[in-house]
Amino acid sequence: MIEAKEDSGPLENRVLRARARGELSADAAFEILFREYRRIVASWLAVRVESAAIDDLAQDVWLIFYGRFRRWEFGAEMESTEARPVLSFLFRTCQFVARGHQRLARSRRSDPIEEAEERAVSGDPQSVLRGVEAARALSLARRVCPEEELDVLLAKLAGMSAREVAQALSITEAVVDHRYRDALARLRAKLRVGS
């Protein structure tokens, strides 16, 4: 089946090919993609919006994706092992949904760090520590990076290539690389000085 790695490339490309061949229904393919990317979608939103809104906004992202996925055109993007059209679509949709929410809310009421620390109580010590450190790093990035750098940083951390990020944000790959380097430099400088 899909998850057995009989086909080459990322899971999403194998799912898209199986769906195009009629081996998977739209719902079965959606379920696999949801399991693969739900944490990434939530993490993208966690950096952008208050923690109380994440679940609702993630649901909005997935509803938008589901509607689009049922009409998905299975084209050349499935042939490249580097391209991940689903991840790119989810990234753009997260940006759109989060910005719409920000325009309505105009304020952040809680910090993702607090929520990560609350959830940390139930995990093993190493994963708890990694989760808290990641939440702190993302919170710092949100404070010190301009929005356009934060967009690139989040996409790169999720594993998107510079080409995918460039296409998603309608910028050049050189600009993606520049913004990514600038975001990392800001974070390093802030960490050296102390947050």
Model-identified regions with their sequence ranges:
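Amphipathic alpha-helical segment used for protein-protein interaction
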Residues: 121-161, 167, 178
